[in-house]
């Protein structure tokens, strides 16, 4: 028999996870989950963040949606082991932030990395012929040194992205821009230090964050249920075909996280990153 009545979500708290490096796959999964939260009219959302950050635009889009959603329902962010760089950025879309005292956070800044293999290519006798429409079309090419004027162009790009980051943190935490710049130099700090700097509101566990979200929504913290909105299958599950034994083996060997990181590195090469390395 099919039960004819739908379970109400108005007395439940939605929960989503943002884990690992933030890239396009993360953005798609999180935005899909946030759409579900909005459509099902949950009164509150708990966002569990355990991420070193990632790509700029993907972080910005998650932040924007969280900020929009926070105008309709109560949204609480809970920092796990690490919530750094882009992980901090997306949390700025949440009016209420809780971290563990030992959480690694901060790393507010931008990094852009390129590799120069010119000498190696010379040793193996490999060279490239490049035809380009402008002098900077092959900027950050791996077969030659970066020119001083190219470095200036990239530094301007980094500085602009950094300014966006600082402004968002200042607005999200109600701090002066100059105050944020005092600690937004790429350094990392603990959750305890983040509390002292005004980057988070409280210290506590994810369970504490759940109870906080319930209270904000006017629900009984001891009775309210938590609905975790699942994300699509990650790469390793697609490769194992969903086989639980293969999945467990991959997890035990550390292949799951390694594949995630390889996928991220391949998809973000040459991009500015809000990432703690």
Curated annotation (Swiss-Prot):
The active site is at 85 (nucleophile), 137 (proton donor/acceptor). GO terms for biological process: proteolysis. It comes from the Bacteria. InterPro entries: ClpP/crotonase-like_dom_sf (IPR029045), Pept_S49_SppA (IPR004635), Peptidase_S49 (IPR002142), S49_SppA_C (IPR047272). Keywords: Hydrolase, Protease, Serine protease. It holds the Pfam family Peptidase_S49. Its EC number is 3.4.21.-. GO terms for molecular function: serine-type peptidase activity. SUPFAM superfamilies: ClpP/crotonase (SSF52096). NCBIfam families: SppA_dom (TIGR00706). Belongs to the peptidase S49 family. This is Putative protease slr0021.
